[in-house]
A protein has these predicted regions:
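Conserved donor sugar-nucleotide recognition element shared by glycan-biosynthetic enzymes
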Residues: 2-10, 172, 199
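Conserved hydrolase catalytic core segment
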Residues: 20-64
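Conserved acidic catalytic loop of the alpha/beta-hydrolase fold
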Residues: 4-22
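Alpha/beta-hydrolase
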Residues: 70-159
């Protein structure tokens, strides 16, 4: 679970599907993958780039998460501080605190009958790739992506770029604006009252934005 492996998987997928021209959308970690791919592998055929609730700096991301933690209850703040200091992320107090944090900035519990079946049906999940790649939670990057810092390289991106984020997102307005300020001629759309999955909380507006963006940036040759 390293950036090189994931980029090579993307390269292999494009080759296998013969995707000579694409609009590349990266959501969350996928945006980091897209940035790594574009900045370090010189791909061709990228019509436009869509960076959805993502980041260009792991250190800024962690700093912003800790800033938001300071708005939580003292009990939750204390539980998170103890977990980070001791490395014990299994205590009941920490699990409750982290759940509260994720509900505030990522996603809540989906109710059966009020959400698509794909979100509510039982599923097997694993943590190994997330733990190895990022860390124990969103605000403690310790994995293979902990050193992801490409903000200073964003000036080299010369393709149309759309940045999407929510006001209550893990991708805070500062994280999103940092990318917007460093990618020339980029467009930034900030969705009010949305967390880390804007596409799920403002679905119609998100789809309309993408449709407009794709139409605007579709190559004439097609």
């Amino acid at each position: 679970w390293t950036p090189e492996t994931w980029v090579n998987e993307l390269i292999a997928l494009r080759k296998h599907l013969n995707l000579t021209k694409v609009h590349l959308l990266g959501q969350s970690w996928g945006g980091m993958l897209a940035l790594d791919y574009i900045l370090h592998y010189s791909p061709t055929g990228i019509e436009s780039l869509i960076l959805s609730s993502t980041l260009s700096s792991a250190s800024l991301w962690a700093s912003e998460q800790h800033r938001m933690i300071r708005f939580m209850s003292e009990v939750d703040q204390r539980a998170i501080e103890i977990a980070e200091r001791t490395g014990n992320y299994e205590s009941e107090d920490y699990i409750i605190a982290n759940t509260n944090f994720m509900h505030a900035h990522c996603a809540g519990v989906y109710e059966i009958g009020k959400a698509p079946d794909c979100l509510t049906r039982p599923k097997k999940t694993g943590k190994e790739a997330y733990l190895y790649g990022w860390g124990p939670n969103e605000y403690t990057p310790t994995g293979s992506l902990a050193g992801f810092e490409v903000t200073d390289e964003l000036k080299h991106i010369d393709i149309p770029t759309l940045i999407i984020s929510g006001t209550n997102d893990l991708c805070t307005p500062l994280v999103a604006k940092t990318m917007h300020d460093n990618i020339k001629h980029s467009t930034w759309k900030l969705f009010p009252n949305c967390r880390h999955m804007v596409f799920a909380e403002a679905t119609n507006q998100y789809i309309q934005l993408l449709q407009s963006w794709l139409k605007q940036n579709e190559s004439v040759s097609r």
